[in-house]
């Protein structure tokens, strides 16, 4: 028996810190908005199980977006981004999430982020407690020192495959 998924995909253009981003998101459900951010290096497919869960989507409008340069979301459109340093700052991502919620006209959304997204959830709670009904920091931390694996640079290791495989293992 075949079944068509009720999940739909859309693009929205938002402006963040003077840059325009074309952001892809999936959504399903009715009720209070639940905005979901994937882990770094992944995309909104991480939330597919949640997007198709009938019990969840009968109470929540689940929205899972792709960060810029991830999944189906593009780098900024109004700049020569390939010539610029790719900056990953808490300020930028907090501004990005708020701009996305504003563009989608979400009132009192819940925000859930995994790993890097969990870190963003904590920053949202700190900086915009009035804007969100609540945040869920899945594997989030208030401080992430970062890491570097020397063996990824070894000629016998394919870092792209290793990273992709590791990220896939984090998906819900």
For every predicted segment, state its role.
Residues 2-22:
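N-terminal cap/lid segment of alpha/beta-hydrolase-fold proteins
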Residues 122, 126-127, 132-169:
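Flexible "cap/lid" loop of the alpha/beta hydrolase fold
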Residues 21-79:
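Conserved HGGG/HGGXW glycine-rich cap/lid loop of the alpha/beta-hydrolase fold
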Residues 42, 69, 118, 142-143:
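Active-site micro-motifs of SAM-dependent methyltransferase domains
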